[in-house]
Amino acid sequence: MNTHLTETWEKAINIIKGELTEVSFNTWIKSINPISLENNSLKLAVPNDFTKGILESRYKDLIVNALKLLTSKKYNIDFIVTTEEKIEENQKNHNNEKSNIVVNDEMSTMLNPKYTFDSFVIGNSNRFAHAASLAVAESPAKAYNPLFIYGGVGLGKTHLMHAIGHYILHNNPKSQVVYVSSEKFTNELINSIKDDKNVEFRNKYRNIDILLVDDIQFIAGKERTQEEFFHTFNALYEANKQIIISSDRPPKEIPTLEDRLRSRFEWGLIADIQAPDFETRMAILKKKADVENLNIPNEVMVYIATKIKSNIRELEGALIRIVAFSSLTNKEISIDLASEALKDIISSKQTRQVTIDIIQEVVANYYNLKIEDLKSARRTRNIAFPRQIAMYLSRKLTDMSLPKIGEEFGGRDHTTVIHAYEKISNNLKKDESLQNAIKELNKRINQK
């Protein structure tokens, strides 16, 4: 980011700050980051689609007028949600470097500046994973290699991975650190094959010091991706480089993952993160309020921590929702306001019935399939077995009749449902990995 853009934006937000209440400014304007300025077009990074919508409908003209007051120019404002993909797209558009080799800056490593060890809230549910991550960050490739972190959605896996990257770069700015999702790794591999750039792709991921791969479970079932990642893993490991991997489940429970990869993932340390307990949820809320400079009554945070239990994203999302509700309605934050703001979220969690649709969605996601696969006529094992599990769970967790369950799975006969239920029931008596899978699926279904 150039100095002129930074200085201009800082002056603009000082003008805007004088036009808004403290709550409105901290909620909507403070989180904006300028990205680029070209031909009177200003691109601003915002944290999510909800914030983008509010800014476009309520605050865009205010920003335009503040900039016009400073520069005598009318700028076109473009709000960009800062997902990995959009950050990467922005880099491609504004980075003059044409080489695929990674350079040492925060943007090239795709690290989120907010995800550091200092901003991570430690509790009983994540203490071990945090300690392992810090040990790896302090002594890359010497403590635990690879480090495999697993846990449910929104529990802090990605935060710890980014924190490791930041810590290493802070202590050794020359380190080549790359953070990538398994989906992005796959897409880059596909493009390298299509464009005949295999060498560049391999150089990018094998000539580095630290590789952080998020959501590794998504390479399961992708033979070419697994083949390439296997050789990438070997090259880095043999060169004594650090590998950190995250997943929503331990290696032994990732379906259709090659055994040679599974065994390598188990070479180092496996650390899990569980859902936060009440004390940790309270600490997370207080940390978020402090960082965002939000004045939230303690009893409101207790209310949120009592009602929202599943993950950190939902906790922080509930807090922002309450602040937004307060700002938009011009009402003080209280338990009554919090109850009103969260009524849809809380009531849906309390009253939502388990349905076959929910079961199919969870099972399909767990096994990296599409819901249509479970309903299809295909009988390959990687589809037939998850389908049988989904039928088993449908009979266990819903009141639907056998014919109705069969109908929801592509119009199958009720005898097929009976066969699936009996097969899974019998296998559960002797198959520990299946027991773990069913336990995890039940947990995810209950969180829906």
UniProtKB/Swiss-Prot annotation:
Location(s), subcellular? Cytoplasm
Annotated segments matching region Domain III, AAA+ region: 110-326
Task: From the UniProt record, give one GO term of the biological process aspect.
Answer: DNA replication
Key word Transmembrane present: no
From the UniProt record, which GO molecular function terms apply?
ATP binding; ATP hydrolysis activity; DNA replication origin binding; lipid binding
Q: Which domain of life is it from?
A: Bacteria
| Sequence segments annotated as region (Domain II) | 73-109
Please list where the region (Domain IV, binds dsDNA) is annotated.
327-448
Record remark: domains: Domain I is involved in oligomerization and binding regulators, domain II is flexibile and of varying length in different bacteria, domain III forms the AAA+ region, while domain IV binds dsDNA.
User: What does the subunit comment say?
Assistant: Oligomerizes as a right-handed, spiral filament on DNA at oriC.
Q: What is this protein called?
A: Chromosomal replication initiator protein DnaA
Origin organism of this chain? Clostridium botulinum (strain Hall / ATCC 3502 / NCTC 13319 / Type A)
Q: What is the lineage of its organism?
A: Bacteria, Bacillati, Bacillota, Clostridia, Eubacteriales
